[in-house]
Regions:
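Hydrophobic anchor at the beta1->P-loop junction of P-loop NTPases
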Residues: 144
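NTP-binding/hydrolysis catalytic cores, primarily Walker-type P-loop NTPases
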Residues: 4, 292-348
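P-loop NTP-binding catalytic core
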Residues: 22, 35-138
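Conserved lysine of the Walker
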Residues: 152
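Flexible beta-alpha connector loops of hexameric P-loop NTPases
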Residues: 48-52, 116-124, 185-202, 218-221, ...
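N-terminal anchoring/assembly modules that precede and organize ATP-driven motor systems
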Residues: 4-45
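P-loop NTPase switch/communication element
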Residues: 109-120, 157, 161-209, 254-258
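Conserved P-loop NTPase nucleotide-binding/switch module
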Residues: 173, 180-181, 211-305
């Protein structure tokens, strides 16, 4: 073992340190001590190196958990954490993991991906940016949906670059990973999991209630989960221009997911939930991964009110296999644009 390997084994994260120092790697997947996979440039492949023993992988997992004041053991075999560089970590051990400890690390770029880079990658088009950028500036409330690894957080970071710098922004996340830049009046809040005595938890609901008392111009929530009813309350009581992400398979599915998440926390009639969704959100953006593993903006829809207790969507752009992103309609609700003194280009 060379001096560097010995140092990484003792002071760093052992064999994973080399991967963590590669800015091109977006995901590190450890399936037991002998099998490591990485994602780079949208493709997943096995790595030739592995841990020297099961105990060494256990040590690394305990080291990560300890740095974040988290506990992982047979009674609490699952932990979410964050590395010093901001990477998001999920670890699972026995008895939940049947074939050895599982460690997954999501890495984020040192510098946030800009909208210019997304345009160069082909993830977005100039036509969609001519719509989305004015909507962000005019404080349209936007929800970004997609599957795991679709680029939701990347899109949220890129859109946030167009928020006027004189606004007060509050961000709320389970694990801090947003890279909001150019906003001097920025407050970052992070949830905290309960300790082993099931106390001292700080939930998304706690932080959303707190954020509303902090005079926000906008609230940016990293991901909507079980406390969705609190986010609906926030966007319905004046936090216009707020943005968030959600796991969903289409713009229509984003409505169903919101309904389900709200019902997990509070028993409300579906028509009441749908009215809150229609009143609180203005725009849905859906992202996905194509068969070639590339990430693409697939759909943009405008929330067009309620008809017979159903949320009505006005499709603005839709991805088609042969044509790419195709404009399907024009924005109907323009009052926020008018108040902001912003005019969309002709045809949008």
């Amino acid at each position: 073992m060379c001096i560097r390997d010995r140092f990484c084994s003792v002071r760093k994260l052992d064999v994973l340190q080399e991967l963590l120092e590669d800015s091109g790697i977006t995901e590190i997947m450890v399936n037991g001590w002998q099998h490591i996979f990485v994602e780079k440039n949208g493709r997943i492949f096995p790595w030739e190196k592995h841990f020297t023993s099961p105990e060494k992988l256990d040590d690394v997992i305990q080291q990560i958990a300890g740095r974040c004041n988290r506990v992982i053991n047979t009674l609490h075999p699952i932990v979410d954490a964050r590395l010093d560089n901001g990477s998001r970590v999920n670890a699972v051990i026995a008895p939940a993991a049947l074939d050895g400890p599982v460690l997954t690390i999501r890495q984020f770029p040192e510098e946030p991906v800009t909208m210019e880079r997304l345009l160069a990658y082909g993830s977005v088009t100039e036509e969609t940016l001519r719509l989305l950028i004015p909507l962000v500036r005019a404080k349209y409330t936007i929800l970004i949906g997609g599957g795991t690894g679709a680029g939701k957080t990347t899109m949220l970071n890129a859109l946030s670059a167009f928020i006027p710098e004189d606004e007060r922004i509050i961000t709320i996340e389970d694990n801090a990973e947003l890279q909001i830049q150019g906003i001097p009046n920025l407050v970052r809040l992070e949830c905290r999991a309960a300790n082993i005595e099931a106390s001292q938890e700080i939930t998304m609901a706690d932080l959303l209630k707190t954020a509303l008392r902090m005079r926000p111009d906008r609230i940016i929530v990293g991901e909507v989960r079980s406390d969705a009813e609190e986010l609906l309350q926030a966007v319905n009581v004046g936090a216009e221009g707020s943005m968030s992400t959600i796991h969903a398979n289409s713009c229509r599915d984003m409505i169903t997911r919101l309904e389900t998440l709200v019902l997990m926390g509070i028993n409300l009639p579906l028509p009441a939930i749908r009215r809150q969704i229609a009143a609180g959100f203005d725009i849905f953006v859906h992202l996905g991964r194509l068969r070639d593993k590339s990430r693409r903006l697939l759909e943009i829809c405008e929330i067009d009110g309620i008809v017979e207790d159903e949320v009505v969507l006005n499709p603005l752009f839709l991805y088609e296999e042969e044509c790419g992103l195709v404009q399907k309609g024009k924005l109907k609700h323009r009052s926020k644009l008018e108040r902001a003194g912003i005019t969309l280009e002709d045809g949008l």
